[in-house]
Amino acid sequence: MQNNTILNEGKLLYTQKKYDKALAFFLGLPTDSPADKIEVSYYLGLCYTKLERYDDALLFLEQVVTSGGNFERVLQCRFLLAVIYALSGRRRLADFELNKLLETGYMTASVYAAIAFVAWEQNDTERCMSYYEQSLRKDPDNVSSLNGLGYVLAYQEKDLTRALSLCKQAVKSAPKSAACLDSLGWVYYKLGLYKDALQYLQQAEQIDTMNVEIAEHIKSVRLKSGH
């Protein structure tokens, strides 16, 4: 079997979204396999990311980034590293990776959205909104930024009309996203439209049943509405 076809089975499993099976395939490769080690690390990093095993993902994504190989692949892994760092509270590392990406011009709208998310986690609301705005100037249909800015505007009780418009657009693009449904429900809550708020928040909870924030939002609506 040629080197460039050894990994085809694992790649196919990954594209079919069978991430557990793809992971097992790549982990099961013999140590003396002639397959490209960096390519194996790349797919292991992707599989672990999809399975939300972020600490495991970091190990392999960092290997790809430090290899200095395929430029597009390195940039993709930098972006995933930044998102994982942000989610796990390692904000300085997230900032470092995101700024490196900005220097290259890679996926600019998504990078701006990620920086905005990090800023929100740091309670820097003005910087957060500024980067969401920059993201939407680059890509007016970026779902993360539509949803993120809409939620922040609602949270700050600033321009609820625009917040509603942004969140509606996000839900239209991603109707099965618990995050987008939650944000839209929260805007309706801020507008005092509790029936609509509960409708979307409950949809969000059905998709992401263990989400504490969604549960808290539903509790807030019920307290206000008397249900």
For every predicted segment, state its role.
Residues 34-35, 69-72, 106, 140, ...:
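Short coil turns that delineate tetratricopeptide repeat
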Residues 29-30, 63-67, 100-101, 134-135, ...:
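Canonical positions in the second alpha-helix
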Residues 8, 43, 80, 114, ...:
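Canonical tetratricopeptide repeat
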Residues 40, 74-77, 111, 145, ...:
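TPR alpha-solenoid repeat register
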Residues 16, 51, 88, 122, ...:
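Structural motif corresponding to the intra-repeat A-B loop/turn of tetratricopeptide repeats
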Residues 11, 46, 83, 117, ...:
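Residue-level recognition of tetratricopeptide repeat
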